[in-house]
């Protein structure tokens, strides 16, 4: 199972948009996909409930309480043969709260919004992330996503300058568009929209999808696989 964690301690960074977009992509690709919504607000679950029966199927689970529990009775039962697990996390996570999430994942995607206040909060979160043993030892690979970006804007230039100092680059730069809101209201993702108008938006995600495909093909040791299994198992 390939586990993708979407996290940022800053609220409003677009975690749910990233989660549902990727869920739509993997489901459309025929992968057995499960969405684990660990945010008490339940936005990803709401999106899933709105999804029309005729769309590519995917499974969704409310996981806020169980993922933080350590008892065997709290094991989350994922659908059998789940191939891709997407974990949507709540805002405001502190170090001791985020660590259990990091142990569940193969990759971490950090969405960010290019505004001074949002960037400041995200930098604090990245500092937390880069201190994790999973990241330092290469067990958890990290990439960034610039959300609601308007190219050639002052905010975009400030984002690039900040990332250059961090020696980090964004896997993708998602343009600012109302299309995501309109699709979400119908339980759809960008990859459910075959219109010509949506093609440039889908192209925004190509670099990230290629990066994820490479990460999924990377070999994982038995020890790493055991750590990642954590309180998640297949029913």
PLM feature spans:
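P-loop/Walker-type NTP enzyme "switch/lid" segment
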Residues: 3-13, 24-99, 103, 184-188
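Hydrophobic positions on the alpha1 helix immediately C-terminal to the Walker A/P-loop
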Residues: 17-18
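Inter-motif core of Ras-like GTPase G domains
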Residues: 96-116
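Conserved C-terminal guanine-recognition region of P-loop GTPase G domains, centered on the G4
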Residues: 120-139, 147
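Beta-strand-loop-alpha "switch" segments that mediate conformational coupling across diverse proteins
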Residues: 148-151, 160-191
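Inter-lobe coupling/hinge region of RecA-like P-loop helicase motors
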Residues: 182-201, 206
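P-loop NTP-binding site
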Residues: 216-235
């Amino acid at each position: 199972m390939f586990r993708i964690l979407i996290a940022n301690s800053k609220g409003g960074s677009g975690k749910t948009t990233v989660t549902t977009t990727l869920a739509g992509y993997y489901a459309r690709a025929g992968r057995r996909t499960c969405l684990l919504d660990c945010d008490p607000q339940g936005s990803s679950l709401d999106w899933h409930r709105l999804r029309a029966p005729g769309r590519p199927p995917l499974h969704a689970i409310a996981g806020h309480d169980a993922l933080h529990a350590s008892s065997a009775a709290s094991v989350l039962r994922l659908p059998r043969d789940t191939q891709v697990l997407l974990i949507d996390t709540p805002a405001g996570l502190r170090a001791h709260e985020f660590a259990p999430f990091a142990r569940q994942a193969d990759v971490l995607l950090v969405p960010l919004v290019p505004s001074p206040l949002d960037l400041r909060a995200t930098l604090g979160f990245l500092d937390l992330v880069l201190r994790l043993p999973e990241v330092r030892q290469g067990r958890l690979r990290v990439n960034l996503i610039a959300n609601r970006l308007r190219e050639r804007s002052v905010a975009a230039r400030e984002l690039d300058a900040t990332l250059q100092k961090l020696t980090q680059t964004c896997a993708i730069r998602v343009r600012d568009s109302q299309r995501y809101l309109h699709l979400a209201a119908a339980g759809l993702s960008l990859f459910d929209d075959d219109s010509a108008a949506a093609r440039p938006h889908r192209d925004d995600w190509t670099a990230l999808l290629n990066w994820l495909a490479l990460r999924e093909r990377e070999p994982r040791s038995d020890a790493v696989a055991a750590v990642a299994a954590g309180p998640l198992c297949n029913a």
